[in-house]
Amino acid sequence: DTVNAIVEIARAFLVPADVSLGVWLFFMFSRMEMLWGRALAIPDMATPNAQFFRWQQLGAYVSFVGGMLFMARRHLAGVLRKACGLSGGTDDSREPISYPLAFWGFVVSIGACLGWYVYHGMRLPTAVAVLGLVFLWFLVYARIVSQGGLYVAVNQWNMPGVIHSLSGGYAFGASGAVIAAMQGTLLFGGRTTLLSSQTMNAFRISSVFGKRARLLLPALIVSVLLALVMMTHQVLRQAYTMGAVNFSDTLQMVMPRGAFSRAQNIILSPGQSVDPHVGALSMGAIGMTVLMLLRGGLYWWPIHPIGFLASTGYHAQRLWLPFFLGWLVKVGIMKLAGGRTLRHARDFFIAIIIAHFSISGLVGILQLLTGGRFPGL
């Protein structure tokens, strides 16, 4: 509706101009690809959720994360030296988590995850591939939300399907297929369950805490534990009072059935469910590599590679126009009115967002207190 459209434009105004332009531009490019697919009668390019776009997005993800790790190689080497007590380590006195704790905690956590996978019947190479794709998505999502300014993103590709197809149908046993399908639904399909972007934003905010920044990690852990207990209680209470069958079809009904259906296809028809698209995968990787090289080599380059990562999916279909309008308003003010007017416009759009979410939050609280009898927005 009109109110939501205005709020989306306000959000897009706050996004860096090169990101908002990239989201709009690459969304239009994806629609051109879809038109080419229809004109050439290629079914895998004919719809927004076609296999071509899924594998192209995966290729872009792999290239983006590879470039990100390459650019951070010196910093990561300094973190490793610091964690191992070697000379030349990077100073972590202003970080919310010490580098030794972060590094060894990461190592122990990865080991525990791999051990859990193997214990429940997943082959070790497959477990490494599953965890690698999970972290690939986490890193991309964190960058899209915290650096790019986008508040949501959707990955099109299916994690167990990718591993199953690239392995020729030999990666998963029965238990491994079920585990991967369930985690693919929970960690890839449910964007609101991901903590990587929220954690990164919290770490950025911690810079204002000074010496107390190290209290952020225990505060985050306590917050997550409390949220898990509260939301688990709330979901179970609603399930037993209203009936779980009355829940939303998409999240509570369709997605669980889809997860078990994917696992069933891998188990019962391993050969028929193998469907790799190496060409689309390569196109996405090459395209993202070129974009990152242009971004790093040309100071004036106006398009951020993050736009390519976030230009497909359900939300992109509804955000492309607000992002274009937000970019147009921002660039127009910068060109015609100057920085002072731009700052005033920024405050105006922030006020719109705060007012919208404050009213929505108040209505939500009143609905909760009245058992849903208070009218919603």
Task: Locate the predicted segments by residue.
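Alpha-helical multipass membrane-protein architecture
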Residues: 1-377
